[in-house]
Amino acid sequence: MTMENDNKGYLLTLICDNSDDKAEKIFLNPKILYIPDVATKEILLLTNELKSKIDLSAQALTLTLTNKNNGVSVDKECEIKDLLDPDMASLMVKDLINIVRGYDMD
């Protein structure tokens, strides 16, 4: 009997609370998102994907990070202006990673 250790990764999701439209991406190692430029780029990609579906200007948004291996998920309510601010966007992602990884260590 072999034991497989398949990493299902971490799912970063941007959700429009009013319509449930979403954009998402899986990362096998979320630590890459600790790099501010990478986090900012990924948030911008998710934002642009969601913008192609709906007008985000007056929408309530939620940024979520889920560990697909154990189901632990944390989210943060946000506004489009925060997501478009590189410092704020990278800080939000870092905070979500720290919380999810904290549960991983318990």
Where are these regions (language model features)?
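Negatively charged, low-complexity tracts enriched in Asp/Glu with abundant Ser/Thr
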Residues: 3-48
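Sterically constrained small-residue positions within well-ordered secondary structures
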Residues: 3-5, 54-56, 67
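Generic detector of low-complexity/intrinsically disordered segments
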Residues: 13-16, 52, 63, 85
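A short, structured beta-strand/loop element
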Residues: 12-14, 57-74
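Charged, amphipathic alpha-helical segments
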Residues: 1, 33-54, 87-106
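Short, compact, well-ordered microdomains
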Residues: 66-98
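Eukaryotic multi-domain/regulatory proteins enriched in long, charged, Gly/Pro-rich low-complexity regions
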Residues: 2-4, 13, 18, 74, ...
